[in-house]
Amino acid sequence: VSIGMSDGTLYVTPMADDAIRVQYIPDGIELPELENLIHTEKQDERACIYKQIGSRVTVSAHGDGLRAVVNARTGKITFKDANGKVILKEDVRSVQAGKTGDFNSLSVSQSFKTAPDEFLFGTGQFQDGYLNIRGLTRRLTQVNTQISIPMIISNKGYGILWNNYGLTEFNPSDYMVVLEQGAGDGTSVTVNATGTAGNVRERRFFNDFSGEIEVKESGDYSILLDVGQSMARKHLLTIDGDTVINANNTWLPPTSSAITHLDKGTHKIFVS
């Protein structure tokens, strides 16, 4: 089912009795033909139930299955079960044209409203130690021991597959702090490393960085540490002397995340 919006077209496709695919294509955009690395099974076209009452459009595979209820004015979607109970409700969606190097690209964001008692699992294999990732910021990159899978499962009985091959931020940060490097050459260690070139001995250097962050109100905050390189050897982040992130091994991804409680006011950050 295609639904015309003010700046694009929304496609809602029942893939099975309990699965619905949603696509949005802005006007004037030609999408390249890319190999589908996630949805690889050939699927026959199937009939679906379509009903419109005023600005409300309901799409489902059949009357007793999962249904998507679309607000035809705003394009926002609410997913309901066969009994009409809300499973998931869309909050904000954004599609903006941009550049990736010399190529035209789209920057897409999608958010949903979740319950305070909900647990979310998924996004792949990470070293941050979190099983419930509700509210946790993660950058989904493939690097050595980190395996990113753009899918989450809820304890409420649903799942979301983000079928997008671009760099993805889960619960993206809305505030960035650039830290200043400390004086001195830093410490170094020599390690044995195994890679595609075989076993080698490497000398690795560590530097210290510091800065401050201003918190407007007390609460739990998600912190993402980005070392600015393709890989890292150490993740150490303290706030006001308290350790928030601490990982040290031969192969670390460039980012790591944690949720911590911060009181209102200024806090000192130290990273090594």
Q: Model segments located where?
A:
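N-terminal accessory segment at the very beginning of proteins
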Residues: V1-V189, G195-L225, S230-L262, V271-S272
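Exposed beta-strand face motif in extracellular beta-rich ectodomains
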Residues: G265-H267
